[in-house]
């Protein structure tokens, strides 16, 4: 018994090439609009405990522009010491 292969080109669609993301350079980025600086928050500020997180949230809400309703968020953090001792 012999094999017979028949190819139907009409049924096979060419796969579209994935679009490459356009590279952004500094000239494409404009100045911020309606920017209001309210606080400095560093990575170490969040690891000092929940009192610090609440303090930051209260400070930012007191500056305005964060909506009328306060948003309640549960924050769980795990601190992992990566220093070789």
From Swiss-Prot:
PROSITE patterns hit by this protein: CRIB
Residue numbers with lipid attached (S-palmitoyl cysteine): 10-11
CRIB domain sequence ranges: 29-42
Classification via InterPro entries: CRIB_dom (IPR000095), CRIB_dom_sf (IPR036936), SPEC (IPR039056)
Assigned keywords, A-Z: Cell membrane, Cell shape, Cytoplasm, Cytoskeleton, Lipoprotein, Membrane, Palmitate
GO MF term list: small GTPase binding
Residues annotated as signal peptide: none
GO biological process, any: regulation of cell shape
One Pfam family from the record: PBD
GO cellular component: cytoplasm; cytoskeleton; plasma membrane
Topology versus the membrane: Lipid-anchor
Subcellular location(s) per record: Cytoplasm, Cytoskeleton; Cell membrane
Family: Belongs to the CDC42SE/SPEC family.
Role of this protein: Probably involved in the organization of the actin cytoskeleton by acting downstream of CDC42, inducing actin filament assembly.
Protein name (record): CDC42 small effector protein 2
């Amino acid at each position: 018994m012999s094999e017979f292969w028949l190819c139907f080109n009409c049924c096979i669609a060419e796969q579209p090439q994935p679009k490459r993301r356009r590279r952004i350079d500094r000239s494409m980025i404009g100045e911020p609009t309606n920017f209001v600086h309210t606080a400095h928050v560093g990575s170490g500020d969040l690891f000092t405990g929940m009192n610090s997180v609440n303090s930051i949230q209260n400070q930012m809400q007191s500056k305005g522009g964060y909506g009328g309703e306060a948003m309640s968020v549960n924050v769980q953090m795990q601190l992992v010491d990566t220093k070789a001792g």
